[in-house]
Amino acid sequence: MLKVIVETKTLVQALGFASSVVEKRNIISELANIKLLAKDGLLELSSTNMDLYLSQKIGVQVVSEGELTVSTKTLNDIVKKLPDSELTLTDLGTTGLEITGKNCRFNLFTLPVESFPVMDNINPEASFKISCAEFAKIIESTKFSVSLDETRYNLNGIYLHVKDSEFYAASTDGHRLSVSSVVLAEKIEDFGVILPQKSAEEILKIVKDSKNANADIEILLSSNKIKFICNENVIMLSKLIDGTFPDYSSFIPENSSSKLVINRKIFADTIERIAIITVEKFRAVKLSLSGEALEISAIGEARGNAKEVINSSKETENFYEYSGETNLDIGFNPQYLEDVLKAIKSDLVELYFSSVSAPVLIKFPESPKDIFVVMPVKV
């Protein structure tokens, strides 16, 4: 029966990833559990919510091989509260899983392994590799504009697609659009799938982990599932959203009459300050643009009003340059602008306007593979 010796910090990290996958409220007890399998010097931890399946292998000292399932939450809550030391996990059969560490012992109830779901096989129609860093970047650049409206289920995820050997991620909630891409090293056939938001968030945590910083992630696709393999020891299988993502290329403005170039950080910080005065019912800030200065203002019902001016400057740390329509006044939901400005760490940001009611194109000179579109609001 299972008996392993493992470093607490190693187990804590793996349980953290596993806990994120497991639903907080499970009426099916098996889905609230994590499966532990000790074999060949590794401890495999498997967790699932039936839409998403995560398998992780960590290095341990295997005293004896075996497998069991135990409450994910209980095991995680215990282990993360223990000091950094070695732990011994021992399957005691009918009396459960024993956890022993420095001056402590816990005994947890277990369930039969036979009742735990098995990860489905996938017959990939396409597969390719990309660096974890590049994959993390395109997901982070698009995850914030996924629609939360469940009636628009085809927008409840990130559209991953390949066109002419360039890998794209795109998302929209109908008010804004985010697109990010990276050129693939290998040539593959065009495809398109919609990755659920939950799955995108979970795989992002894994690829951003420091031990995967210089690793590649392999992506395998079928018509209804996607499989991620990271560093060989982490496998995530996810169902895909069964729907058609809109042709977003028609949403991207091609012509503009005015252009704003401004220091990204100053612009973001100013919007964040002015937005404090706004209220949830109607969140809007007004940009008043001219060649001399940018005025950002807002009026908040029952709160007051706010205004801040950014003057024209050619210095990088407070750069501001505007050309086009004289004295343009346009309104935005401040959160939409803040999300874009936080997604890309660039010195400058460019905004392209065609009218006060038309979508605005946002680009970053230092990150040309990222494109954002935001709809204005009336102010």
UniProtKB/Swiss-Prot annotation:
GO terms for cellular component: cytoplasm; DNA polymerase III complex. Pfam families: DNA_pol3_beta, DNA_pol3_beta_2, DNA_pol3_beta_3. Its main location: cytoplasm. SMART domains: POL3Bc. It comes from the Bacteria. It is found in: Cytoplasm. The keyword Lipid metabolism does not apply. InterPro entries: DNA_clamp_sf, DNA_polIII_beta, DNA_polIII_beta_C, DNA_polIII_beta_cen, DNA_polIII_beta_N. One of its GO terms (biological process) is DNA strand elongation involved in DNA replication. One of its GO terms (molecular function) is DNA-directed DNA polymerase activity. Keywords: Cytoplasm, DNA replication, DNA-binding, DNA-directed DNA polymerase, Nucleotidyltransferase, Transferase. Forms a ring-shaped head-to-tail homodimer around DNA which binds and tethers DNA polymerases and other proteins to the DNA. The DNA replisome complex has a single clamp-loading complex (3 tau and 1 each of delta, delta', psi and chi subunits) which binds 3 Pol III cores (1 core on the leading strand and 2 on the lagging strand) each with a beta sliding clamp dimer. Additional proteins in the replisome are other copies of gamma, psi and chi, Ssb, DNA helicase and RNA primase. Belongs to the beta sliding clamp family. Confers DNA tethering and processivity to DNA polymerases and other proteins. Acts as a clamp, forming a ring around DNA (a reaction catalyzed by the clamp-loading complex) which diffuses in an ATP-independent manner freely and bidirectionally along dsDNA. Initially characterized for its ability to contact the catalytic subunit of DNA polymerase III (Pol III), a complex, multichain enzyme responsible for most of the replicative synthesis in bacteria; Pol III exhibits 3'-5' exonuclease proofreading activity. This is Beta sliding clamp. The lineage of its organism: Bacteria, Pseudomonadati, Pseudomonadota, Alphaproteobacteria, Rickettsiales.
